A protein has these predicted regions:
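Glycine- and Gly-Pro-enriched alpha-helical subdomains that act as flexible
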Residues: 186-197
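Glycine-rich anion/phosphate-binding loops
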Residues: 60-65, 85-95, 125-137
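Catalytic domains of carbohydrate-active enzymes, especially glycoside hydrolases
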Residues: 67-82
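Histidine-centered catalytic micro-motifs
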Residues: 8-17, 81, 188-189
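Divalent metal-binding segments
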Residues: 40-67, 84-88, 155, 159-163
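Active-site beta-loop-alpha junctions enriched in small/polar residues
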Residues: 14-16, 86-87, 112-116, 155-158, ...
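Active-site gating loops and adjacent loop-to-helix segments of metal-dependent hydrolytic enzymes
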Residues: 14-60, 111-129
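Active-site gating/metal-coordination segments in enzymes
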Residues: 80, 98-101, 106-183
């Protein structure tokens, strides 16, 4: 689809995602009761204090729920959605395709890698060229053997200070951008200096 045909587009969403890379078991006994609780409105007020201690807040796997939510956006005039769930966060090209077909929404899928805690165990073995090639394949041929192509490079997560691996991923992503012309989405860390890295 051409960008001018997308219509109203949300540019940073995660329809299905696994953010367990952020999970940690809380020290406080009162917060431990939330670890395996389902996400319901009655726990919403507690969320700022337990966001990374509650598995249901970090894992979204329900395709039917996503279809229902996306349908609301489409019915309100939405035309496009950028799903920045990158490799290591549970990116699911087949599920995104299913959601798109069920709702008629154009979904732009991401590529590349997020923060180190979400990197695959073999990331250290991959060269910059390997990562560049992988991202380009996602964009030009599709993810795995699905034929479903990524349309954005990212969300690339960064911490502060940048690790050598994060620098390698950023360089590989930049090289893939130069070759494909695909846009890039970078999520800098929370540190004040992080965006300037």
């Amino acid at each position: 689809i051409k960008p001018n045909e997308l219509g109203a587009t949300v540019t940073h969403e995660h329809l299905l995602v696994d953010l367990m890379c952020y999970f940690y078991e809380p020290e406080e006994a009162s917060k431990r009761s939330f670890i395996d609780k389902p996400f319901t409105m009655d726990v919403r007020g507690e969320l700022p204090q337990i966001a990374f201690n509650m598995k249901a807040n970090l894992q979204y796997y329900d395709i039917e729920w996503s279809i229902a939510e996306v349908s609301k956006f489409v019915n309100a005039g939405g035309g496009g959605l950028v799903d920045t769930t990158s490799m290591g966060l549970g990116r699911d090209s087949l599920a995104l395709c299913r959601i798109s077909r069920a709702t008629g929404l154009n979904i732009i899928m991401g590529s590349s890698y997020y923060i180190p805690q979400a990197h695959p165990s073999n990331i250290g073995e991959l060269s910059e060229a390997d990562i560049t090639k992988q991202i380009i394949k996602d964009i030009t041929e599709g993810v795995s053997d699905t034929g479903i192509k990524a349309g954005i490079i990212g969300e690339i997560g960064n911490l502060y200070p940048l690790s050598d691996t994060e620098r390698k991923i950023l360089r590989a992503s930049a090289r893939a951008q130069i070759e494909t012309g695909c846009p890039v989405s970078i999520h800098p860390g929370a540190h004040d200096e992080s965006p300037m890295q």
